Amino acid sequence: MGAKLRREWLSQVLGEGTRVRPYLATHMPTLDRTVVPALAGDLRTADRREDWESEVPPREAAAAKGRDLLGGDGLACVTCHRFEGNPGLLMSVLDLAWSRTRLEWPWFRRYLVDPAAFRPGTRMPSFWPEGHSAMPDILEGDTARQIAAIWAALQEARVPGAEPAPY
């Protein structure tokens, strides 16, 4: 969790019970706020990936292309995921718009390439198996550029209500 979640989000989850998956019956317990800053820091330290630390999110990525990739004519992420408060077409799991608030870029970049490596048993497929894009006509099929474009689109995404649900 320390390499995946931004420190601010981790602190919110631990101290306030903030969540983005209201469909789950289980959740993290809310902890005494006096221990949250140290625990959040300790979790990040314990999960530190030194080889990831110098990575910074892309600054100039094609957010419009990222939205295309997220949509039904692209990788169809919106088939399963909520996006900007809109339900997924078949399921309505985690709203992708919260990614910018929750996730660290280095983790996100690696997760998209191989979700099963991070979450064995996940239903989320890899859209870049063996480094080859499922959408070769978008951004010349370049894996790094496509993932950067998705990240850019998520940085601009809106969530109605703008606050995740507390317990």
Regions found by a protein language model. Give the residues of each.
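Flexible gly/pro/ser-rich segments immediately N-terminal to CXXCH heme-c attachment motifs
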Residues: 1-4, 27-34, 57-61, 68-72, ...
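Gly/Gly-Pro-rich "capping" loops immediately C-terminal to redox-active cysteine motifs
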Residues: 1-10, 30, 82-111, 126-129
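An amphipathic alpha-helix signature
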Residues: 7-11, 15, 36-40, 105, ...
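The canonical Cys-X-X-Cys-His
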Residues: 10, 28, 39, 66-69, ...
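Periplasmic/extracellular electron-transfer cofactor-ligation site
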Residues: 19-22, 71-93, 117-120, 159-164
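A cross-kingdom feature marking solvent-exposed beta-strand/loop segments within repeated
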Residues: 22-24, 132-137
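Short, structured interface segments
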Residues: 30, 35-54, 150-155
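Electrostatic cytochrome c docking/interface patches
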Residues: 47-72, 161-167
